[in-house]
Regions:
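Conserved N-terminal Rossmann-fold NAD(P)-binding element of oxidoreductases
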Residues: 4-8
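N-terminal Rossmann-fold NAD(P) dinucleotide-binding loop
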Residues: 13-14
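C-terminal amphipathic/interface module of NAD(P)-dependent oxidoreductases
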Residues: 46, 50-54, 234, 241-276
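NAD(P)-cofactor binding segment of oxidoreductase domains
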Residues: 62-106, 139
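Conserved Rossmann-fold NAD(P)-dependent oxidoreductase catalytic core, especially the SDR/UDP-sugar
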Residues: 92-130
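Substrate-positioning beta->alpha
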Residues: 157, 166-169, 177-200
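Mid/C-terminal beta-alpha module of Rossmann-like enzyme folds, strongest
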Residues: 195-198, 202-250
Length: 276
């Protein structure tokens, strides 16, 4: 039986773990809280209380089995850390994984590694982040590619949508929102899970892939439609011809792995109200 550890059993990591368990994988994972770890044990996921910190570098003996797996998936964002801290912690995780014979590492990065300017950005485009998170992720990607693990995949995710998570919740009723004519770059949770599974099943050296729905309505068009669908106050956008037309190109994974988006159109990501 193949085994995998997911560092970060959160909004993406937990449903991914449950999906892989259904496919017959032996799944381990981590949560910050011992209470949360115990709850996930009851779901059949071997869960360890573990968080990125200086303390983790002492790696207590009861945590070591987390790294005794075939593959390691890291889904933790850098939001709580300085760039230096985050990269040091990821380097430590990768080093521990390599020491214990892990052959495959998958890291969920973000399309924020690209600037908010007009253009089409694919996996070969020059990285030039504008946000601190984006700059940190660029360093993290480089760090993990240099880890020495045989197979390492960087999966850059566009804006995330899924059960009980939709950007319109935060935009509803707001006025004077910028860049109404800019296209959206979004991806559904289910597509994230399916893409990571495809990578897991097909390790093949060092790879970078984007994940983003191939249809890109404007922000004003899409979030107006979403607000109407969910019966929320319609957000008011300022629209200009000069709004940046930033498009994330994400068809390489389709060509290389035969991946097919279940949600190619953001309109299809609108869920029934009971799940919102």
């Amino acid at each position: 039986m193949k085994s995998v550890a997911i560092v970060g059993l959160g909004w993406l990591g937990l449903p991914l773990a449950l999906h892989l368990k259904e496919l017959g994988w032996c799944v381990k994972g981590s949560k910050q809280s011992p209470d949360d770890a115990q709850k996930l044990h009851q779901l059949g996921i071997e869960t360890y209380p573990f968080s990125l910190s200086d303390e983790m570098k002492r790696l207590p003996d009861h945590i070591r089995p987390l790294f005794n797996v075939d593959a390691l998936i890291i889904t933790l964002p850098p939001s709580r850390f300085s760039s230096q801290q985050y990269c040091e912690y990821l380097a430590f995780l990768a080093n521990q994984a390599k020491k214990q014979g892990v052959q495959h590492l998958i890291f969920t990065s973000s399309t924020s590694v690209f600037p908010d300017i007009s253009g089409q950005f694919d996996e070969s485009s020059q990285l030039s982040a504008e946000t601190e998170m984006g700059k940190t992720l660029i360093q993290a990607e480089q760090c993990l590619f240099q880890s020495g693990i045989s197979h390492c995949d960087i999966l850059r995710l566009a804006g995330l949508i899924g059960k009980q998570r939709h950007p319109v919740k935060f935009l509803a009723g707001k006025r004077n929102l910028k860049q109404g004519n800019s296209p959206v770059n979004l991806v559904h949770l289910e597509d994230c899970i399916q893409a990571i599974t495809a990578l897991l099943m097909n390790p093949n050296g060092l790879r970078t892939y984007h994940l983003c729905a191939p249809i890109h309505p404007t922000r004003a068009e899409y979030y107006t439609k979403a607000a109407v669908f969910y019966d929320l106050s319609i957000p008011q956008f300022e629209c200009s011809d000069s709004d940046p037309k930033r498009i994330i190109m994400a068809d390489k994974i389709c060509r290389d792995l035969g991946f097919a988006y279940r949600y190619p159109n953001p309109d299809d990501m609108l869920e029934k109200r009971s799940d919102f």
